[in-house]
């Protein structure tokens, strides 16, 4: 079968999506005697499609190139977040019509991956210099699936914190390498009939391909954090469209923000914070960190 021939080709070190030629002779035995035929045959194996060098869990995948934020310096390449076996994702800024590539080191061998004219993810063979481009500059979420040899691009627009009570919005700036943030942020909470001391539920919103999605907590109704709460409290999970806006929300930490006196029906934090969203591989998951502004500057 073709699959059996492909397996033989792999043993012969033939690369995927190439042709390889195997030569053969017949060796005959009779007791202790043996003879090798003078005639030689050969057959060509058409190797199946695929990626030869699949990175393991401990072999990171990066995006690099003139079209990326590292300007072609592989030492500054942005690591992609491993989502699952063979699946990697990154949020990054790309330049229109400028080349980039995906790379990894697999069993000590530097490997590069690109997308062909048919949109198929492939591994570059020795001597090849294929790259990837996008037609429009912008911030993208890029997801590659090496097992299925696919790639997807999502254009990212505004990113902001959103208080459900009062509909208050705080926009974030793109900081580079998959990070968004705001400095000297003054948190606020608004009183409600069920929350006389103020409703603090909030989440983060992101425009993806023109549609606004929420990023929230993994639990539907998580309680309020304090100063000893583990940082994983603010790990970010993309929520399905149509999810109730109050569910899977975060809550502010009263001990950190130290609310002032009520002004009208709103409380304002007396401690300003620097808030950073990490949509990259820095912490092994997408997450948010809040620091008092003075501490963040130190």
Residue ranges, per PLM feature:
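Insoluble glucan recognition modules
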Residues: 1-293
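A short, hydrophobic C-terminal helix/tail in secreted or cell-surface proteins
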Residues: 294-298
């Amino acid at each position: 079968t073709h699959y059996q021939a492909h397996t033989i080709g792999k043993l012969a070190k033939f690369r995927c999506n190439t042709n390889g030629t195997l030569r053969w002779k017949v060796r005959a035995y009779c007791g202790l005697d043996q003879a090798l035929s003078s005639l030689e045959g050969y057959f060509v194996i058409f190797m199946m499609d695929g990626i030869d060098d699949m990175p393991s869990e401990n072999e990171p995948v990066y995006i690099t190139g003139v079209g990326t934020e590292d300007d072609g310096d592989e030492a500054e390449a942005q690591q992609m977040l491993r989502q699952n076996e063979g699946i990697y994702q990154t949020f990054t800024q790309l330049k229109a019509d400028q080349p980039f590539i995906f790379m990894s080191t697999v069993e000590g061998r530097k490997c590069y991956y690109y997308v062909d004219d048919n949109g198929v993810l492939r591994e570059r063979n020795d001597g090849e210099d294929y790259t990837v481009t996008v037609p429009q500059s912008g911030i993208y979420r890029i997801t590659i699936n090496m097992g299925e040899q696919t790639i997807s691009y999502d254009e990212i627009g505004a990113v902001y914190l959103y208080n459900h009570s009062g509909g208050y919005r705080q926009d974030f700036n793109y900081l580079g390498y998959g990070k968004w943030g705001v400095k000297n942020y003054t948190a606020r909470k608004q009183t409600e009939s069920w929350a006389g001391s103020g409703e603090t539920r909030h989440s983060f919103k992101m425009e993806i391909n023109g549609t606004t999605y929420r990023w929230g907590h993994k639990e539907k109704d998580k309680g309020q954090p304090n100063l000893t709460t583990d940082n994983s409290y603010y790990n970010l999970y993309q929520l399905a469209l149509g999810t109730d806006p109050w569910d899977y929300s975060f809550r502010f930490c009263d001990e950190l923000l130290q609310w002032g006196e009520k002004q009208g029906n709103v409380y304002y934090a007396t401690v300003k914070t620097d808030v950073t969203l990490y949509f990259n591989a820095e912490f092994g998951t997408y997450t948010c960190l809040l620091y008092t502004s003075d501490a963040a500057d130190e």
